[in-house]
Amino acid sequence: MARDYPLERYRNFGIMAHIDAGKTTCSERILYYTGKSHNIGEVHDGAATMDWMEQEQERGITITSAATTTFWERTENGTEPDSEKHRLNIIDTPGHVDFTIEVERSLAVLDGAVCVLDANAGVEPQTETVWRQADRYKVPRMVFVNKMDKIGADFFNCVRMIEDRTGARAVPVGIPIGAETELEGLIDLVTMEEWLWQGEDLGASWIKAPIRDSLNDMALEWRAKMIEAAVEMDDDAMENYLMDGAEPDVPTLRALLRKGTLAMAFVPVLGGSAFKNKGVQPLLNAVIDYLPSPLDVVDYMGFKPGDETETRNIPRRADDDMAFSGLAFKIMNDPFVGSLTFVRIYSGQLRKGDNMINSTKQNNERVGRMMMMHSNNREEIDEAFAGDIIALGGLKNTTTGDTLCDKSDPVVLETMTFPEPVIEIAVEPKTKADQEKMAMALQRLSAEDPSFRVETDIESGQTIMRGMGELHLDILVDRMKREFKVEANIGAPQVAYRETIGHEVEHTYTHKKQSGGSGQYAEVKLLITPTEPGEGYSFESKIVGGAVPKEYIPGVEKGIKSVMDSGPLAGFPVIDFKVQLLDGKFHDVDSSVLAFEIAGRMGMREGMRKAGAKLLEPIMKVEVITPEDYTGGIIGDLTSRRGQVQGQDTRGNAIAIDAFVPLANMFGYINTLRSMSSGRAQFTMQFDHYEPVPQNISDEIQAKYA
């Protein structure tokens, strides 16, 4: 069977934004207008289709990126289509900082993105974070300025903010007519017409009209800016425009705007209000006009499984005749089907019952059930093609970031990097019956979410959950209760401290043990040096002339590494140092790998104490947005939390305060902030770097953990 839709009519795109900009509402409207969803789900009623976990519906935020497939016929007048049906695969990504990892995963498999802004707040901190992530994955994007019906909505201020904050060139292609309660429609700068929404049929019908006189000058001014950006994409068009003042016709103009968007030379901007159902159809048209199809994307370069240099020299592209390859970018537990693995197919075809290999883990997998997802409704399918985003049921060993491919032509597409967790809590099952359920729940949740780690504390035997923030762990604990029916006691959140060394030191350690028969003997001379923050650990042997035989050197490193998990001050992991093995002595009979391992371990422990071991704490980048009246109090409070205020600037009618604050002092901050600002201020924070802990606090922590 052949594919139903040619690749040029595919659009794989994500919807990304700051929390509360209206991302999920936009996705809902898209599903409504494209006929996938028969009633419109409202986030504030807890009924949005894309937010399908109970907690998402209760908290009104999106946690997991739901992938959904829908179809759109481009239309200018709302009644007859002017293009054939396009297939849209949409991924709704979370906007809360604790879930940046979800965004990271979905960006890896998208071709394009729509960035949704709040017309009042503009480019917010999380928008910048996501924008930078999208830059890293080279994802072409366009902007939809949402909530134009809100008080204080300002489209042109948003356009300025895009340029100031992200450095991208913003090119409006559609300008809202009116704002706040006066929002009537939008000016299409490409065709120079007004779109005016009619009546109360949820924005499904509109009329096109010539631009009214009062708006004509403004429209011409912005159209000229748009054309200038567009003609830069083609020498002939530019020459005609500059020499003869000849403007490109509508199809040429769209083609040039598309070329510039794909080259990331600029970002098309439109405005509207998803909640009021105004501006969603022009947005869908723009997705088709300007965002890439899988054919517009450069070849995805992978590397050969087992290649340690990871030389990316194996191309994969959207071609059905190539060998099959796909990337598993998300795992979800579906209450009815069990574990579902979301896969983006980069090349080739996949059929039900096919055998394939997981080249990341070198395991075989078999395709059991194959589904096309619509939020959380599923449609069983028998085959899928390059460019599709599908869900597979029944995969045994595949986790997020793994490559699935044809056995005869294996490739590894991606090695996703996931941030280290900065906050941890201890969990204990309430009853014996809960214990087994909890182990299964934690295993499933950590398979779904690589930024969540589960460890057992060696000394206390407690189970430790580690994550990216309070909200992240809150929701995971909540899911354990709901989805897996586990009752557990939760400890207070703890900070993930680290240890490092203050200065370089040379240390010799001799391990001698005589107890009748053959004894143990090993001597090592170590040079322990601090490295730059974030550089991590390295080991190097400088042994010449066999002072320590080759076969014993791995023992020394093993001993050194065993100290890294539990530093000398308070038992926290040790980071950012390097060790050189300078010299040593051995005994023909009494030396062994074990003896050198013990010497390495003890030498490292003593050496670290001599090297001025220091305790490090995670420092968070905090941004508080507050009405001006509360600024003084909030800055005072941040300073009292050992925060360093970096500056403040005006954001609309509010003030944004930037600061670095130790995580240890940020627990429960949301409650303090709410009471200080009568609930009007909000904040976001994300991990930035590690810094040494002041001595008096370090002493307290050491006493507590000793």
From Swiss-Prot:
Compartments it resides in: Cytoplasm
Record flagged with keyword Protein biosynthesis: yes
Claim: Protein biosynthesis is one of the keywords in the record: yes
GO terms under cellular component: cytoplasm
Molecular-function GO terms, alphabetical: GTP binding; GTPase activity; translation elongation factor activity
Amino acids binding GTP: 17-24, 92-96, 146-149
Chief localization: cytoplasm
GO biological process annotation, one example: ribosome disassembly
Keyword terms of this UniProt record: Cytoplasm, Elongation factor, GTP-binding, Nucleotide-binding, Protein biosynthesis
SMART domains: EFG_C, EFG_IV
Record family assignment: Belongs to the TRAFAC class translation factor GTPase superfamily. Classic translation factor GTPase family. EF-G/EF-2 subfamily.
Job description of the protein: Catalyzes the GTP-dependent ribosomal translocation step during translation elongation. During this step, the ribosome changes from the pre-translocational (PRE) to the post-translocational (POST) state as the newly formed A-site-bound peptidyl-tRNA and P-site-bound deacylated tRNA move to the P and E sites, respectively. Catalyzes the coordinated movement of the two tRNA molecules, the mRNA and conformational changes in the ribosome.
NCBIfam families linked to this entry: EF-G (TIGR00484), PRK12740.1-5 (NF009381), small_GTP (TIGR00231)
PANTHER family on file: RIBOSOME-RELEASING FACTOR 2, MITOCHONDRIAL, TRANSLATION ELONGATION FACTOR G-RELATED
Name this polypeptide is given: Elongation factor G
Species this protein is from: Jannaschia sp. (strain CCS1)
